[in-house]
Swiss-Prot record:
This is Strigolactone esterase RMS3. Disulfide bonds: none annotated. Involved in strigolactone signaling pathway. Functions downstream of strigolactone synthesis, as a component of hormone signaling and as an enzyme that participates in the conversion of strigolactones to the bioactive form. Binds and hydrolyzes the synthetic strigolactone analog GR24 and its enantiomers in vitro. Forms a stable covalent complex with the D-ring of strigolactone, which is essential for hormone bioactivity. The D-ring is attached to His-247 of the catalytic triad. Coiled coil: none annotated. Changing S96F: In rms3-5; loss of esterase activity. Ramosus phenotype, reduced plant height and extensive vegetative branching from both basal and aerial nodes. GO terms for molecular function: hydrolase activity. InterPro entries: AB_hydrolase_1, AB_hydrolase_fold. It is an enzyme of class 3 (hydrolase). The keyword Nucleotide-binding does not apply. Keywords: Cytoplasm, Hydrolase, Nucleus. It comes from Pisum sativum. It holds the Pfam family Abhydrolase_6.
């Protein structure tokens, strides 16, 4: 699109509406994850899509292992993209890692975001005693890292159907494709960054209205995490319980998710 950051992250703006809507994908996918959700919004919004630096669709030379040790660098990328497009106000839909990135960005620049819609969001994946159930023990996480390191292909083949959750073979194939597109060392590095992060302390600083979308069964994010986030986010927040399974409803139930997004955006 003419500037280095927009070209580097394959930024696209689709649609003809007056307002901006950002779709930011999560770990293991790229912007194509939104392809069956996108058509529902191009009449009402200018929709901004981009690829995270870790996506297989981005030149891996852009991934600086020293810089991307925390989500702050992903926040920098998001804000630089919006500034390059001269966006002054937008609604934001973030999945997984990008849900938390959106929250961090809203703390830095609250005036930029009218609403955050957070899909499969978690501020902390590890359990913390009796006070917080993130879904994983440290040993389980280390086992995941070891499996990724030992045989990435085998790990993807096992992980993709578990993450999708629902019995939707096309979604499993699509998620597997984008996982395989990632360079394995980058995939492992990002996994370590995400699973070892603890962003519970920033929730109270988020004052932009939030809608937390939580599926019926998500192997990565227990339902209790959605409730925890609602209770700790500083501003107005709601939980929208989705009548579908898995961590990737935009792949497994795109038309249903699009309808739920329309409801959230209208409120």
């Amino acid at each position: 699109m003419g500037t280095p950051i927009l070209d580097a992250f394959n930024v696209r703006v689709e649609g003809s509406g007056d307002k901006y809507l950002v779709f930011a994908h999560g770990f293991g996918t790229d912007q194509s994850a939104w392809q069956r959700v996108l058509p529902y919004f191009t009449r009402s919004y200018k929709v901004i899509l981009y690829d995270l630096v870790c996506a297989g669709s981005v030149n891996p030379d852009h991934f600086d292992f020293r810089r991307y040790t925390t989500l702050d660098a992903y926040v920098d990328d998001l804000l630089n993209i919006l500034d390059s497009l001269h966006v002054t106000r937008c609604a934001y839909v973030g999945h997984s890692i990008s849900a938390m990135t959106g929250m961090l960005a809203s703390i830095r620049r609250p005036e930029l975001f009218s609403k955050l819609i957070l899909i499969g969001a978690s501020p902390r994946f590890l359990n913390d005693g009796e006070n917080y159930h993130g879904g994983f023990e440290q040993g389980e996480i280390e086992h995941v890292f070891s499996a990724m390191e030992a045989n990435y292909e085998a790990w993807v083949n096992g992980f993709a159907p578990l993450a999708v959750g629902a019995d939707v073979p096309t979604a499993v194939r699509e998620f597997s494709r984008t996982l395989f597109n990632m360079r394995p060392d980058i995939s492992l590095f990002v996994s370590r960054t995400v699973f070892n992060s603890d962003l519970r302390g920033i929730l109270g600083l988020v004052n932009v209205p939030c809608c937390i979308m939580q599926t019926a069964r998500d192997m990565s994010v227990p339902a209790s995490v959605a409730t925890y986030m609602k209770e700790h986010i500083g501003g107005k927040s709601t939980v929208q319980w989705l009548d579908t399974e898995g961590h990737l409803p935009h792949l497994s139930a795109p038309s249903y998710l699009a309808h739920q997004l329309e409801i959230a955006l209208s409120q």
